[in-house]
Amino acid sequence: MKKILILIAFIPVLAFSQGYKKHTLQKDKLSITLTEGVLNITPLTDKAIRIQWQKELAVEKEEFVLVNKHAIPAFKVTETPAKLNLSTKDVVVSFDKQTGALSYSNSAGKVFLSEKANSRRLTSATVMDQPCYVAEQGFNSPKDESLFGLGQFQDGQYNLRNVSRKLIQVNTQIAIPFLYSSKGYGILWHQYGLTYFNPADNSIALTKKEAGAVQTRDVEVTTTSGTQKVSQQQSLYSGNFKLDKPGDYTFMLDLGNMDNRHLLIIDGVAKIDQSNLWLPPAVSKIVHLEAGEHTVQVLCKASNKPALTWKIASDESVFRSPNAKSLDYVVFYGKNADEVIADYRGLSGNVPMLPLWAYGFWQCRERYTSGTHLVETIKEFRKRKFPVDVIVQDWQYWGKYGWGVPKFDETNYPNPEQFIKELHNLNAHFSVSVWENLDKKSDVAKPYLEKNLYLANSPWIDIFNPETQRTHWNALNTNLFSKGVDSWWMDATEPENDALADKQTYFGPGDFYRLTYPLFVSKAVYNGQRTADPDKRVTILTRSAFPGQQRYGIINWSGDIGSNWDVLKRQIVAGLNYNLTGMPYWATDIGGFFRPGRGQYTDEKYHDLLTRWFQWGVFCPIFRIHGYQTETEPWKYGEKVEANMRNMVNVRYRLMLYIYSAAWDISKNGSTLMRPMVMDFSADEKAVQQPYQYMFGKELLIAPVTEANTTEWEVYLPKTAGWYDYWTGKRYAGGQTIKAAAPQDRIPVLVKAGAIIPMAKEMQYTGEKPLDTLEIRVYKGDNGSFNLYEDEGDGYHYEKGSYTLIPFSWNEKTQTLSIGARQGTYPRYLKSRVFNIIMVKENNGVGVAEGKAFKSVVYTGKVLNIKV
């Protein structure tokens, strides 16, 4: 930070170095020569514009994100005495010759984004003795703008306008430098290294108290060497600062390394207070303060060195990357978030379909200890009629082979092919944990060592090297995939604890590529499996991500989080912002990873939390339970909890066709399943600001309960033609806040008027029963439509058109349900089936129970019109 602050002192001088000299129109871009360097404006699509400013250093040669090359869109350049304008069909980029700033407007001439004048900067720096720049760009941000995205963070900040962010990859935090605005645009800050958003440059001097060790305690932590008991000492720091005027101020507390406590006290009041065995190094908060003197206190691990910085809220958003080769960003514009994200994915990689079973229930714990343990657990699920599709083997199955070695120790897993076959015979799929820091003393590591494929002085492999990727996949294929493993749990892919800083990689200094390690881990596995078995869809659960990673069949989860109501609330916010970065598949450890020990099985307070968390998990893109040193099987918590969980799992499986059709919408059209309210109700400001509710698909509004002992819950219903309570059928007008019933057995779920929801039968696993009879629930009150998508459930034949679509539409004026002609075929598709048409009303067509049909029709693929 000191280096950055010193360099910033020269910024006023540098600003004059961007004076306009001339411009050149090239086939694919407009190049503007400045007093220093060249500014390139490149239209990538009609709605996506790439900006690159380069000076003396060569630009980054490796293209990690924007891998899909499109035809050059039609564009023209016009000039006035004051401006240069580059226009595509949908966007106009204007360059101000006097200030050098860019502004962006739509085809109607409305400006939706503009750079702040004199805020574009490339300041000379070095990293690992190699020259680089501190790249910085400021954008004007009007007061009525809301900003979302940047990945998954644990501080509970939803609207990111004026929030400071330190984008690094660590456990529980995922850094994705993609920002979405309520104004209808997205920005990909195209840097691969450490990035700050709204950097706070005013430092507060902190003094460590003489009696600094205020607490010493022994805790168990998960580490790259397994579970360890460590003694942790905490220190108290204090300081003071003075403000010249009242206002909102953003604070960033950066502890330097992972910690177990975020405690910031300002004027005797705790403004940030979070505890967990793993917390990211940096945390942020916006605080309103009056002018004058203020005091601060910070508590952290004694081994950490806290830095506290602040800035006053302003009408500007800033990106800064301290290890850059050029300034590089892409602006995406659209009528809505779906258009923005679809265009972004079109350039960075579309999302492949996951197998049907991946949308079912995942049973996971830390940990199963043998092949027999896994098989017997699935047998118990089947015996208890509790639906499940996936069981997961966590770490340490490697035993004698050494830490992180992807190979089953025969002591407890004597015949991997056999126990995995037994799981398959029980109609379960198997996922296994894999790490990228396998023990160098193991036989499996020999090829890595012989080819020098580890990072120097590090336990982590250099996954950037194509040879490492091939070698790594060969190890996974030989020892795991060939034995029958169905999917991958790629753990600690940050790599853990921000391990690339100051490390040399295949591409060069790791600081340049500090955020991208997880991208290459997923690439290695995805490409390897698709080559080894093109008929088996790749499914990768991974703890970290970077732009473009969505093209590799990934799911993220929120890492090793704690288990209390505040943590639950913060996961909702974390997930919503994550999903607005174009990454559609996400989950949490239902119930929290770090749990309250043996008492959790009988503690009714914890049961309340677990039950509510599980109910929310039903409506997450991926539905997975997990816990540290915990038997997470539902029956361990007693009959009441098990019964509630079973009922909610049945809801998930009855909605499976709705979910799978939404998955197709993701892959085909660039849609999103877990949808922050800004995606569908951007004109409703009250809806946009709701941090704890969202749309699941485009028809279901989900409002998780995040407080103990609750029987009703406030839900804001956006301004539409109306809403139905999913559980009761009661209808509500839009544009109001209601108190929805929230008894212990359910959370509020509202259905948008005009929705058409297909309901499958209850099943013990996906594909258990033929879908020859479906319930079609129609929610009158507005026009609506739905496309029912089906395919083989696995494999990639859908990429070549092997699937069916059945279009449904409801006409409110004529009170007619139309079922269109079936489009397409795939092997063994149903040529004839029964649709039970349910006109939803109070106490009919509600919840998990089957409704009373208004009419039953036999559908053979031909058009049907059903008049109500």
Q: Where are each of the predicted segments found?
A:
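Aromatic- and carboxylate-enriched substrate-binding clefts and catalytic-loop regions
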Residues: 273-274, 283-285, 301-306, 387-645, ...
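A low-complexity, Ser/Thr/Gly/Pro-enriched, surface-exposed linker/loop concept
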Residues: 18-23, 27, 42-85, 121-125
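Solvent-exposed beta-strand/loop surfaces of large extracellular or lumenal domains
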Residues: 20, 60-76, 263-283, 451-454, ...
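Catalytic core of carbohydrate-active enzymes
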Residues: 527-528, 535-538, 545-556, 578-588, ...
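Bacterial Sec-dependent N-terminal signal peptides
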Residues: 1-21
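Conserved, mostly hydrophobic/aromatic
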Residues: 41, 90, 178, 381, ...
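Catalytic and substrate-binding clefts that recognize carbohydrates or anionic sugar/phosphate headgroups
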Residues: 79-353, 365-366, 371, 378-383, ...
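Short, well-ordered beta-strand segments enriched in hydrophobic/aromatic residues
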Residues: 32, 41, 51, 86-93, ...
